[in-house]
Structures are given as structure tokens and as C-alpha cells.
Amino acid sequence: MPATGSSPSDVLIVGAGPAGTAAAITAAEAGLSVTLVDKARFPRDKCCGDGLTTLALRHLDDLGLDPSTITNWFDVDGAWLRSPSGREVFVPLPSDGRFAAVVPRLDLDDALVQRARSVGVDVVEDLSFVDLEQHVSGVAVTFDDGSTRDARWLVAADGMWSPIRRSLGMSPGGYLGEWHAFRQYVSNVSGSAASRLHVWFDRDLLPGYAWSFPLPGNRANVGFGILRDGTRSGKDMKRTWDDLLQRHHLTEALGPDAVFEGRHTAWP
């Protein structure tokens, strides 16, 4: 654990989400010494639809991640799409490989952190960025435990509201992103959503959509994403969520005994 008074790393990465762990694994496999720091302790959850596209799966293959080690991995064979008019179509995926999957971020991110450790990355949890100072041979980064870590290169993988980017004056003030999303896990799913990936393009959500992504054990990740246009307040978003959960095509897909777990999460 390189800290104040110890040898610097070649690469210091702040943020151990998929971007940070991918950078860490790639750098370590290239022969660089890598320290990966995150403010959380893993496993930890993130608001996400949990879907993995074909390109994401290929990247995970390149990183050496083994899907068989993740209990809550669910392979998807296609998608059921519902148009604003109510017409539904099934779009199959090729059957000769893995082209889409659903994996909770709780499990995926933790698996990537463990993969990083396995290739020699020094992973430090429960540590938050405070400040940085650039110098002739690299950068010195101060954390909330009072330690300073030196590195030749710093990778800011600390999210959309990156404290590192903000410390460098590179974050636009008041920017909340272009999209807003709600998500909640559902258990005891007995309808088609237990095994099918659904995407609903309801008219009032366009150009966004609602989804139900299947998970093992008759669970699903259910949510919606809409374009942030400045006319919808947080309360409006919550009303949209409550209304969406009453729509027939969604309740039918989940089944009559579906149970919503805990509370919903929103982003941003």
C-alpha cells in the first residue's frame, strides 16, 4: 500500500468501477505497478440497469473475467420490444455465443475488483480523494486519512461528478447530465419477465424507455430512463415511476406476486 514516505506507483487510479478496474487490469498486465483506490468497500451497489452489451462482454473477456464465477449472471437470448402503439416484437440474438447478459453491479464490480487483485493491483478501499499536486515526476494525491500517494500517472475514474476533475477546474457547474433514471429490484417474478428481457417504449417516456432485465432466482431489474429537459422535477420523476408500475404491460410481465425489494434508486 504505497502511501506517504513509500515508493510511488507507476499508475494511481481513483475509482474502482468498471472503468477504473479495466484500466488497472490493463496497466498491471502491461507490467506497470498500479494502485487502485475507491471510497467504498466492495461489494457495493450502484444505480444501473445491469445490462451488458456484446461489446461490454468482449471487453470483459479481454480483461480475463470468468462469468462462471459470478452467481447472479444471467445470459440473455434476445429482447422483447414494445412500441408506443403497443405492438410487441422479439429480437433474437445469435445462438452461437454470448451476446448479452444481465449482472447486478453489486456482483460485477466486485468481481472486477477481485480480478484486479489477482493480477497484482494494490486495491485500497474506504479511501476518498481530497486534493492533488502535480510535480515534475508525476502527481501527489492526498486522501481523507491524511496519506499522500505518489504516482507517475493519475487516472480519474471517479464518476460523472469526479472530485479530481472538479479539483482541476474541469467540471461545468450545475451540470446534472442529459438523462434521469429510476431503478428497483423485484423478486418473486412469475410472469414473462422472469426469463425475458423487456424494453417498453411508452409514448410519454420517448426518447427514453422502461425496462425489465431478468436475473437468476425469478428476480428482475426494473426501471426507466428519460431525457432531462428541464421541465420535470424530482417529484414529477417519482410520479412517473409510480404510474409506470401500474401499467398493464409491466404488471403482466412481472406477475401478480412480484415483490419490490427495498427502495428504488435514482440517477442522478
Predicted regions and their residues:
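Beta1/beta-strand and adjacent pyrophosphate-binding region of the FAD-binding site
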Residues: 4-19
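Conserved N-terminal helical subregion
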Residues: 6, 58, 74-75, 80-167, ...
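Small-residue (primarily alanine) positions within well-ordered alpha-helices
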Residues: 16-19, 23-28, 116
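Conserved Rossmann-like nucleotide-cofactor binding loop
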Residues: 19, 42, 161
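Glycine-rich FAD pyrophosphate-binding loop
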Residues: 28-48
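N-terminal FAD cofactor-binding segment of flavoenzymes
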Residues: 47-80
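FAD/FMN-dependent oxidoreductases across multiple families
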Residues: 72, 148, 230-268
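Conserved FAD-binding catalytic core of PHBH/FMO-like flavoproteins
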Residues: 160-250
